[in-house]
Amino acid sequence: ESSYLKEFFNQVDKSVQELWGEHKMPLVVVGDAKNIAYYKEVCDRPDNIIATVSNATHLDDGSAQHIVDSVQEAVEEYRASLHQAALGEIDKARGANMLQTDLQEVYRSAFQGAGETLYVRRGYIQSAKIDEKAQTLSVTNDPAAEGVTDDAIGEVIEHVIHNGGKAVFMPQDIMSEDQPISLVTRY
């Protein structure tokens, strides 16, 4: 029986890895403890598994929402660990003098390709006048004014990603109102 199950989970894993290659999403494995153990044994990339849930009930007749509800706690714990790790990275960069929190400096570094990781408080929007030639960003409170970009944060995010960095959105309760953006620089 175990060899059949392992072969079955090996086939499942090949499909999972094919999907993972396209989307790079974290994986939560749901099932009973025995099947989870078999899957982990044959899985090509066990590091992709962020959580396992063996206490979900009625999986045979459960709806998709039932399964989502059963993994929610594990996903929230994973997110919390990512946020704590992000705060650690921010502190480490601050100590190494590789952190910028002033929006003008963040913009300039992002534009120049120096941004490694941009941390942004969810929902943070700021209108500003951007001059790419001078590499300046001037905050304004009138998003409708001529020459004003209503979402300068979106522009910063685009520059960071375009230059090979990444953007991480942080919960509002973790990143404060007075420091809604932080950029860890490459150098």
Where are these regions (language model features)?
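Terminal alpha-helical anchor/extension segments at protein ends
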Residues: E1-Y187
